Each structure stands twice: as C-alpha cells, then as structure tokens.
Amino acid sequence: CHAFTGPGGGAAVTTAEEGETKVGRFKLLYPGLYVYHCAAAPVPVHIANGMYGLMYVQPEGNDLPPVDKEYYVMQSEFYHEPPEVDDDGRRSEIVEFSYPNGLREEPQVVAFNGSESALTRDHPLKAHVGDDVRI
C-alpha cells in the first residue's frame, strides 16, 4: 500500500525540476507502515536505484501497546545484467541495470534492509525470551 493516495500518489506535488525546490504537506489519515518511492518516470528504474523506503504513521495518541524491541524490514530487489569479466578473468563487481528483468520482475538479487545478510550475520534481529517484539 502506498503512503499517499490520489492521482500519481502525490507525484504532481512532489515532483521538482532540476534546481527547483518544492514543499508539500500531507494529512496522514491512516496509521500503518507504507512504502514510498519517487514518481519520476520511468519509475522501475528509480526504484531499482534505491529511491524508496518505509514510512511509519503512528496511530493518533500512539495507542499501540509498548514493546521491548521494534524492527523495520524492507525488501529490495536488484535487476541486473550478468557481470562482465575483467581482464584478469574475475567477474566485475559492477553490474548494469536490466530494464527487461525489471519489467518482468525477475530479480537477480533479493536483499533486506539494503544489503546481503543484513538481518542475519551483520545485524541480526535480537530479542530476549519473553520480550514483546514488533516487526
């Protein structure tokens, strides 16, 4: 679900030309966790380049029960061409975006919170027995 409703999800208000500044105000009517992304065309290319994130709208009065731990998890998908082979025979670490793979929604990599092993090896979600946890 998107954070903003209406034509283009607020794109007309939030789209700025190079060198231009815009300010938009939105009344957040529905509490919840939402995805936001830029609205510049072509949207799949911008999303593939990381122009998205999460927006948490708390209920009025913050009437959610208190918890010991709270975690936010965002899935990312990366659509790229096969890596080129460098002169030394190793695969390049730089890959090129694949528009066809993006249109087909066939990711070559799926990551959480922006990187491989982000929620396991590098930054595991931790809690103690008996903790109340919100994910």
Predicted features and spans:
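Acidic-aromatic/histidine active-site loop/patch
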Residues: 69-129
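A short beta-strand/turn structural motif
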Residues: 48-61, 86-93
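Residues embedded in well-ordered secondary-structure elements
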Residues: 15, 27, 44, 62, ...
